[in-house]
């Protein structure tokens, strides 16, 4: 018969592929369960209020038109719904595909069973497949994996959340219109069961059997599979556990399969008492907590409570004397085993001869250890007992008492067993690899000894007092030949023959009185020794390694091991070299990967890599978590060192008087520093002792592990310091900003110095790590803050700054800002608010408008540089850009609402436009015409002013940031600054040359050079924020004349001061000149340059017309508004870096030259 798993056996390959896919689906479900968007849980009030109207459960399907109608009625809900779709469609699609694959899995399994039934596979029926060893394993696994999928989904992704995600996917994707979509079936299968994994939650009635029966499966198939599992040892594991008391451990994998499959046939659990008694007697006579898949544990006492037959059958196991007997037995086993294992682990104890002579003894010890560890870990686990269930609590307390449970002792036994197992495996692997060479070498040695003895008895080779003996000569030659003829490939015959040869050599010594000659005796003894070694060597079988692999399975502890993390970390803190022992435990845990990967590998599935990566990644994550105690302890010591260096140790001057030496010695403090530094070095050594290890398919390099751990701890501490240090009280007078920045700078300097100090002791690049991680923290927080302004948000798993190994912590927001960078930015905006402060450009200083006291100045930005570095300034700059974009977008909406939808306003503007055309002319009776137009549009200006001033204020801040960045770049990195300036000028020259002569080269649109150089220029402050285009715009009617009117409306609020320029006339009616100019400049910059030309022409016309009118008076004087308008033009060309001729085209140059003197 063809091998069931052969590639040409279609029947075997079909079921193998199904089972392989089942394991891959479970891995995907486990992976995705960590990425459920929290918004679908609707846990906190903010989410409920914001998204409650757009997230629906399955009640949506009762009346989709009603729900959609409610959304369409409110444009803001529609907008939120669209934004929500853009942000979540990718992850929703991934979840849907996983859910769909579960449904497809059971459909494919049912189709396979139908094909078997209908005889599609020649000579194969359900019965014949179940008779085949691989066939019955695969059929049992196929149904079991489906059950595990359903349980995993319900445990990891709550029913309500599933429903909301499915409805969201249905609404947002094309699934509703797709004909071949099986959305209905998926929704029926995965609708909420009412189950909750929260502790103390009540179990729904008929759960999980009603859930398992949502897709009908052949009754015959289920009962036949249960029958097989009841009667057979389908994995042949009993041979690896010969002792009867280990039988339940031998059948543990099969027991887990049967436990899950029984839910597909509830009558067995409810009423088949004899069957359940048989099942319990075979699988659960001495255990009631089982692991069903990769460490997912269940307590039969709890889960079988609703089933009469199952509960009754289990009562014998849960009988108090039985529990006491089992727990006491394992207590005794541990007491006797632990010293034995520790003896084996002593240096030099496990020698090759000892191992080869004691294989059964060593394997028995390993078996007993693993069985004891398994029973105790499962039956004492907190997760296995519901604390709200009194009976479960009693059983747990009894187990803990009777087994004398001590988690530290159990953990130590696990460590020692893993180490023992690891050493034994390594020895066996080496012996197996050398087996043939050694055997041949012993054979050669033995044969040569016999040949030499034959030569001795020939009389040719002189040996003291050995007479010539032809019989013995011939006999020894024959023995040499026999030894030489032994064949390695036929180990059974060779072994038998070797035993006979040993006997013959013993007999020849006795019969021929050869004992009298010591040298001959020695030759014979040596040969016997070599023959014995040959027997030992031929007995080194791979079966021993296979048995060790089966016995050493630790997959049941995949999740439970986490409960020992604190003990592991405490052990490492006390003794860092403990890491070497932990390595063996992690490798033992890695063997759990064999379970899900076996079938995937057999099927040559492409899923092998992704599933291996998932489980290996989870294990490596756990290894990192355990070893994180080393960086944590290092940083604790480091904090003490920095405290001593900063506060206690006085810096030694370059010149020192001899008699002052004792004062500066400070031996106690320096000894303390040395002691702490030594502790840091020991921790480093501890982690580096763990050799490079392959955990699953991921290579773990201890040096990298240490560096990542140090980075993680640094990130955690710096992020916490930034979060706590930059929280501001908006009511505080004066602002807390500068004091807090100074404190922050001191804190960051402490971290920086400590890193500088530590780098040589732990062999890392301190400055490089510091810069990389601080920039990552700042950039990540800026990204999170900017998400508030983005429609399509950047999720953590999409962020280039967030990392799974070195995560940046997220903190709940304390105000409207998401992060510390947002709080810092808003505090700066608050204290430089143009409504309460006046910015004097020549001084780079903000003054309070009422008290005229200085509020802050450009030193603020050097303080930010000291505390957050250039990354912080750069991040602040990026955030201000987003804020400006938002303000400009709001402004466009405001313009459309106030101007373009107001008919009377448009009439006023149209009339004014007629009067001022042509702009080169002069408006007669200008004062009256302008004031009438301003009066009619009066309502518009407050909101307009607010928007312009906000943009202007942020542009002032951006200029200051650019100045600080440019200064520090030229100071700290003059070569970079010079290179960037030259490069920038060269590119601009090339672009200008290209526009004059298109045959010359120029960067094309798809070339990223311009984007990359822009990022560098902005980081170095070599840019002008006022030239930036923030938004794309369309033509707006009346735009130049509206801005002109707005400016003229604001001029009466301002007055000219020879020393300060334009200042606010009345603090009660606040306005700040520089933000006003920069706001208008930025706004006009977003549109076509002809708008700016028209706007400047209108101001020129206003100046000329007003001067014309004022000179006709008896005492001509220059009106204040004209001075304001002239100042505006002067400042406009100054800030925009335009040539003066631009405004001189509209106003005669002598007026510009003289207006200050006239005033």
Curated annotation (Swiss-Prot):
Record-level GO BP terms: protein transport
Transmembrane segment boundaries: none
Record has Transport as a keyword: yes
Record-linked Pfam families: Strumpellin
GO CC annotations on file: early endosome; WASH complex
Main location: other
Family: Belongs to the strumpellin family.
Function per UniProt: Acts at least in part as component of the WASH complex which seems to regulate washc1 nucleation-promoting factor (NPF) activity and is required for its membrane targeting during endosomal sorting.
Self-association state and partner proteins as the record states: Component of the WASH complex.
Protein's recorded name: WASH complex subunit 5
